[in-house]
Amino acid sequence: MRINPTTSSPVVSTLEEKNLGRIAQIIGPVLDVVFPPGKMPNIYNALVVKGRDTVGQQINVTCEVQQLLGNNRVRAVAMSATDGLMRGMEVIDTGAPLSVPVGGATLGRIFNVLGEPVDNLGPVDTRTTSPIHRSAPAFIQLDTKLSIFETGIKVVDLLAPYRRGGKIGLFGGAGVGKTVLIMELINNIAKAHGGVSVFGGVGERTREGNDLYMEMKESGVINEKNIAESKVALVYGQMNEPPGARMRVGLTALTMAEYFRDVNEQDVLLFIDNIFRFVQAGSEVSALLGRMPSAVGYQPTLSTEMGSLQERITSTKEGSITSIQAVYVPADDLTDPAPATTFSHLDATTVLSRVLAAKGIYPAVDPLDSTSTMLQPRIVGEEHYETAQRVKQTSQRYKELQDIIAILGLDELSEEDRLTVARARKIERFLSQPFFVAEVFTGSPGKYVGLGETIRGFQLILSGELDGLPEQAFYLVGNIDEATAKAMNLEVESKLKK
């Protein structure tokens, strides 16, 4: 797919400098601008307002054209606060959509929606930039082969595998390990696939964005000493930003990811946290533009906006963008138009469980609630499919027996059920795994477990070959050989204590 590198964001040529308009009306973050006859800007063009406010402060506001109103008027949405703007101020049409820096120079840095660095680490190389509005890859460019994107995380690869170039919904409340899971995925794609990641913080808390940045520096995902060796670029448009910025920051992150896929031919992970806020910002902008609201007050263009973002996230013959999107479900109502529209685009869901987190099972991925369209025998093979189904059946049976165990105890179960419970508890613990990015907190080295090793481990547990090992031997280990070695160490320790 061709990317047109352009000069840095809005630089105005002498020809375009003549295309000046004036502010006619300001309604919060929305501006109406009058242009000379025949000089109307295109939809999505970036407009720049420069000048000084009443107290002499410098103003530099970038807007995006959303509507052509007639009578030489356009309606534009501001990407930053409109404080200090006045009617009659001069507006420059840049003649092109917003363009942001792309390429290796973006790694390890934090950007806003305009592609400007906001981390106080100096300017970014802007020789290569790309417009944020582009069409999705043509069908002929797509890679139609279904293949699994191996993450090295046992519970994900076995029970809810990710599709290469697919879209995954990440569900989980606060404090269940969403951030750590995201950082581990960023780490693993860099090590195993030679890929990079782009994180789009869409409408979330500024504090959370800062915490993520600090944790990434601590875990080595962002390399402070050599910023070029970092594995991720961050793009933030947080809760305090105007709706225009929150609506477009996802596209800024996606544009950076597309460059790594199309030009560098890499596998890219694109994180969007939170996809619901993207819809919410679009709803605010839609109301400000005077459009008639649709179901539950959402914008009438909800499906179109979501589709134009999601269709650009795909595998091409050059590389892939695999997207992991945190999904906030308002009032836990899955039928709400925002999450319902998102679900239609997802290939897999990873559900984090507070119950598992409370038990200390990390990653706290729920093996029964997490799903994937990839878990089919024709895609993953009979061996993988059979193993995954037996793991789920064993876990489900254990879940059903928990009430009986709580009331009557284990002794009242049949011999077969007791064996099922013992194996299910081993499986539950074996689904936990030490993470590379958590080494600094736990002290235990991280483990990347290949898919073949993962399947072999669970087959051995299900076959009963490891029934004699204590269940704590399976907790926070990598492959099954580590579990057997840990069991031997535990046995030696217990003998020494005696």
From Swiss-Prot:
Q: Does Chloroplast appear among the keywords?
A: yes
Q: Which domain of life is it from?
A: Eukaryota
Provide the primary localization: plastid
Sections of the chain in a coiled coil: none
Subcellular location, in the record's words? Plastid, Chloroplast thylakoid membrane
Give the matching CDD domains.
Answer: ATP-synt_F1_beta_C (cd18110), ATP-synt_F1_beta_N (cd18115), F1-ATPase_beta_CD (cd01133)
Species for this entry: Licuala grandis (Ruffled fan palm)
Pfam families (UniProt xref): ATP-synt_ab, ATP-synt_ab_N, ATP-synt_VA_C
InterPro entries with a match to the protein in the record: AAA+_ATPase, ATP-synt_VA_C, ATP_synth_F1_bsu, ATPase_a/bsu_AS, ATPase_alpha/beta_chains, ATPase_F1/V1/A1_a/bsu_N, ATPase_F1/V1/A1_a/bsu_N_sf, ATPase_F1/V1/A1_a/bsu_nucl-bd
| HAMAP family with a match to the protein in the record | ATP_synth_beta_bact
Record-linked SUPFAM superfamilies: C-terminal domain of alpha and beta subunits of F1 ATP synthase, N-terminal domain of alpha and beta subunits of F1 ATP synthase, P-loop containing nucleoside triphosphate hydrolases
| Sites where the protein binds ATP | 172-179
**GO-annotated cellular components:** chloroplast thylakoid membrane; mitochondrion; proton-transporting ATP synthase complex
Query: EC top class, in one word?
Result: translocase
Enumerate the SMART domains for this protein: AAA
Q: What is this protein called?
A: ATP synthase subunit beta, chloroplastic
E.C. designation(s): 7.1.2.2
Role played: Produces ATP from ADP in the presence of a proton gradient across the membrane. The catalytic sites are hosted primarily by the beta subunits.
Q: Which family does it belong to?
A: Belongs to the ATPase alpha/beta chains family.
